A protein has these predicted regions:
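Short, solvent-exposed loop/turn segments at the edges of secondary structure
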Residues: 86-90, 115, 131-133, 163-167, ...
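Short Gly/Pro-enriched turn/cap motifs at secondary-structure boundaries
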Residues: 126-129, 158-163, 182-183, 211-219
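Short helix/loop capping segments that flank catalytic or ligand/cofactor-binding pockets
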Residues: 58-60, 106, 128-131, 160-162, ...
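Short Pro/Gly-enriched beta-strand edge/turn motifs at strand-loop
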Residues: 116-122, 151, 202-207
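Amphipathic, small/basic residue-rich leader segments at the start of a protein or domain
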Residues: 1-86, 93, 97-117, 129, ...
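A glycine-rich, basic-preceded beta-loop-alpha segment at the flavin cofactor/substrate interface
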Residues: 200, 205-207, 221-241
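Beta-sandwich/jelly-roll carbohydrate-recognition scaffolds of carbohydrate-active enzymes
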Residues: 106-110, 122-141, 157-158, 177-179
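A short core secondary-structure module
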Residues: 147-204
Length: 241
């Protein structure tokens, strides 16, 4: 089936221009996206294909996204990761479906403009597709002001975009010994949003690049020791714990 005119125009216009701007060899050699290329991507909606227009997005059909990703992926693994993750495993889609109004209004416009670069922290040394085996832990507690927070300890690896990300969607198993959330002592696995550099994240460390299958795209480990986040950083709010 043919794409709608506006989607075909994006494929024939900005996508082709992006591939002309970026030097595939230099991207592979340096493992870095030049500032002008990143700005072009942000200005032209490459990070916004999974976000509704009301939040500054540029929603695309599944067919169009597939065509765009296939073309970009045929040129560069780094460019591919920068397009694919924000429009699939990034925070945008699940926030759009399940986020609170406050989360949508705060995160989605920044994701659409590339101010937040997302990654999804699931894979661990002993857990990947078997997500139920993850060992990342979050302990629910009240701070000195009585605010409910989580203390997170985790070791993730092979996380695509981790070396360049500043917004982590972290899969973690919660323990609530005082039943502060009202869901028992073991609420289970949830996803918590962590902003790099936010107060309480001093124990967050993003390591060097991995090189999966020899490709030089941003992929690396994330380690957290006593990282503190508020309970409202659960994607979708505390009811999704």
């Amino acid at each position: 089936d043919q794409l709608p005119a506006h989607e075909q125009a994006f494929l024939d216009g900005p996508v082709e221009e992006l591939l002309k701007m970026a030097d595939g060899y230099e991207l592979s050699r340096t493992r870095k996206l030049p500032d002008d290329v990143f700005k072009f991507m942000a200005d032209n909606g490459f990070f916004a294909m999974q976000i509704a227009k009301e939040y500054g997005g540029m929603p695309m059909s599944t067919q169009a996204k597939s065509c765009i990703m296939a073309k970009v992926s045929s040129y560069s693994g780094l460019l591919s990761a920068m397009v694919v993750i924000p429009n699939s495993l990034g925070a945008a889609e699940l926030l759009g479906h399940y986020g609170t109004d406050e989360q949508k209004n705060y995160y989605l416009p920044k994701l659409a403009k590339g101010e937040f670069i997302p990654c999804f922290g699931l894979t661990e040394p002993t857990a990947g597709s078997d997500a139920a085996s993850l060992k990342a832990e979050g302990v629910v507690f009240k701070d000195d002001d009585g605010e409910v927070k989580f203390k997170l300890n985790f070791r993730k690896r092979y996380i695509t975009l981790a070396p360049v990300a500043n917004l982590i969607s972290l899969a973690v198993r919660l323990h609530d010994p005082e039943n502060l959330l009202g869901k028992g002592e073991e609420p289970g696995i949830t996803v918590v949003l962590i902003e790099k550099g936010a107060p309480g994240t001093e124990g967050l460390h993003i390591g060097d690049h991995h090189q999966p299958i020899g490709e030089h795209f941003p992929n690396g480990p994330i380690v957290g020791r006593d990282v503190i986040v508020a309970a409202d950083k659960v994607r979708g709010g505390v009811e999704y714990t």
